[in-house]
Amino acid sequence: MTRSGHPVTLDDLPLRADLRGKAPYGAPQLAVPVRLNTNENPHPPTRALVDDVVRSVREAAIDLHRYPDRDAVALRADLAGYLTAQTGIQLGVENIWAANGSNEILQQLLQAFGGPGRSAIGFVPSYSMHPIISDGTHTEWIEASRANDFGLDVDVAVAAVVDRKPDVVFIASPNNPSGQSVSLPDLCKLLDVAPGIAIVDEAYGEFSSQPSAVSLVEEYPSKLVVTRTMSKAFAFAGGRLGYLIATPAVIDAMLLVRLPYHLSSVTQAAARAALRHSDDTLSSVAALIAERERVTTSLNDMGFRVIPSDANFVLFGEFADAPAAWRRYLEAGILIRDVGIPGYLRATTGLAEENDAFLRASARIATDLVPVTRSPVGAP
């Protein structure tokens, strides 16, 4: 569309003042031979899963003229069954809420427990959607730094929570982009001092060597919310399904802020089909962990500094110019992630042949390594 012969831009629109100058979130989506930038499970769904999804969606399509189950009860019951089996913690549909990806879950949580006059704290570098969603809900964003190895210094974190008294505390475990998990004793230290809601983001929980924070929900019912996704280990990124685990009162709060019929019939049917094949899908986790360790050892041997990871990716450096190094990988046909940390890049653990290509390129690029000043900042 044009105005007086000139294209209409954002400057011509009555955009909110706090959105001016901002850039949209999103990893590059490029057609390259090796894509290791968005932490997906590289193993495609099995034929049995694909057939089940097709059959389930076909059955759901019969009623596409009707709205879906607005509370997604059957899906939530299936998620509760999966989590009970995985964690050993007895959960019911009343403990689960589901939405279109964990980002929508996080947005709903901030709509309910954040907002104008309230604040949220995160320990950076961490998942960059936490501050973006905070900004979008007019929740004041507070940053506290991690240790030099990008791990969570629990004493520093506790002091920051005590000092700033945030309404929402974000704790990513494993953390993205550094990969470290937080132990249950350290989580308890933070939960003990959190004045409001603590959100433990377990997007990569299936890869973690630590027990899930789900085991603490009963002990901290008015404080703890655990968020998860089917986009990572579950190999369901295209299906867009996230969920949370909490006391039933938190689900009641979600009902106050969710949009009506937010989960389509198709999404619910496809996700339930995927859950029926969880054992087959998650059998790839052990192989991905083994590949992650192989990549870590190889990068270390090349002279890179590799942050020990408990997820399906590695953060590595130290580059004199990380953006330039990122471009060199891209020129080699390999897409990884510049997460905004000076001197560092992040690479998803791919299939063995993808990791081989990544390591061959890394061996060539390793000659550019020099020490850099570390500066933990917010990262995608």
UniProtKB/Swiss-Prot annotation:
Pathway annotation from the record: Amino-acid biosynthesis; L-histidine biosynthesis; L-histidine from 5-phospho-alpha-D-ribose 1-diphosphate: step 7/9
Classification via CDD domains: AAT_like (cd00609)
Pfam family, one: Aminotran_1_2
GO biological process: L-histidine biosynthetic process
Keywords recorded for this protein, A-Z: Amino-acid biosynthesis, Aminotransferase, Histidine biosynthesis, Pyridoxal phosphate, Transferase
GO cellular component, one term: peptidoglycan-based cell wall
Presence of the UniProt keyword Transferase in the record: yes
Residues with N6-(pyridoxal phosphate)lysine modification: K232
InterPro entries on file: Aminotrans_II_pyridoxalP_BS, Aminotransferase_I/II_large, HisP_aminotrans, PyrdxlP-dep_Trfase, PyrdxlP-dep_Trfase_major, PyrdxlP-dep_Trfase_small
EC numbers on record: 2.6.1.9
Catalytic activity: L-histidinol phosphate + 2-oxoglutarate = 3-(imidazol-4-yl)-2-oxopropyl phosphate + L-glutamate
Mechanisms controlling activity: Inhibited by 2-(N-morpholino)ethanesulfonic acid (MES).
GO molecular function, one term: pyridoxal phosphate binding
Cofactor(s) required for function per UniProt: pyridoxal 5'-phosphate
Miscellaneous remark of the record: Was identified as a high-confidence drug target.
Record text on subunit structure and interactions: Homodimer.
Known role: Aminotransferase that catalyzes the conversion of histidinol phosphate and 2-oxoglutarate into L-glutamate and imidazole acetol phosphate. Shows lower activity with aromatic amino acids.
Family statement: Belongs to the class-II pyridoxal-phosphate-dependent aminotransferase family. Histidinol-phosphate aminotransferase subfamily.
Domain notes: Hydrophilic residues in the substrate binding pocket and N-terminal lid allow the entry and binding of the preferential substrate, histidinol phosphate.
UniProt name for this protein: Histidinol-phosphate aminotransferase
Lineage: Bacteria, Bacillati, Actinomycetota, Actinomycetes, Mycobacteriales
